């Protein structure tokens, strides 16, 4: 076997990962996306909104939105990062206590990383089961998040859902305000409307 006949297959083999990488494409997070944290207390309910967050979503092709809506697993990775200081509860005192409870000074971000997922057809879209890890207050735990994906405006993909999280499971103490008369329940709900576009 000649040197040239060996070199050709080796060159082709070297191109395979490059070709695979070139087909990966990010899905862009749209500014209309929303993420909220809501809960109850001994006095009243509350809701905090993330004024800024990031979602890095990579797909295995250039038409991932259409593929996902068709029930195809076209997304290859998902990492959502929320700067905890960007949570706004529309109340200065509540903001201060919530940020203290989430240990913002030590752990400035909340991170959700998807390790695997399943899709299933639903009457109003595609049911999505996300299996991943949630890092909150410096503690990482496995979590399963259920969501619904459906077509949004202007060719976008809207992924919506609500997930309950217990603060104490992550070593966090729920906020207490008004000299202890207002105690926040340890169960908070994370709601999201993530809008993505090819």
State where each predicted segment sits.
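Bacterial N-terminal signal peptides
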Residues: 9-18
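Low-complexity, acidic/polar, glycine-enriched regions of mature
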Residues: 21-198
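Bacterial N-terminal signal peptides that target proteins for export
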Residues: 1-10
């Amino acid at each position: 076997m000649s040197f040239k006949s060996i070199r050709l297959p080796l060159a082709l083999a070297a191109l395979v990962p490059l070709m695979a990488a070139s087909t990966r494409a990010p899905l862009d997070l749209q500014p209309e996306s929303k993420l909220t944290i809501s809960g109850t207390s001994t006095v009243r309910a509350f809701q905090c909104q993330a004024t800024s967050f990031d979602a890095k979503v990579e797909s295995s092709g250039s038409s991932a939105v259409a593929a996902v809506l068709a029930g195809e697993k076209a997304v290859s990775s998902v990492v959502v990062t929320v700067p905890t200081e960007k949570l706004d509860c529309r109340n200065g005192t509540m903001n201060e206590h919530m940020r203290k409870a989430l240990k913002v000074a030590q752990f400035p971000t909340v991170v959700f990383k998807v390790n695997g997922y399943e899709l299933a057809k639903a009457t109003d879209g595609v049911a999505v089961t996300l299996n991943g890890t949630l890092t909150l207050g410096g503690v990482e735990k496995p979590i399963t998040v259920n969501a619904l994906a459906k077509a949004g405006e202007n060719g976008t993909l809207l992924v919506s859902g609500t997930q309950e999280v217990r603060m104490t499971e992550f070593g966090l103490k729920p906020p207490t305000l008004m000299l202890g008369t207002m105690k926040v329940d340890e169960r908070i709900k994370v709601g999201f409307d993530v809008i993505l576009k090819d």
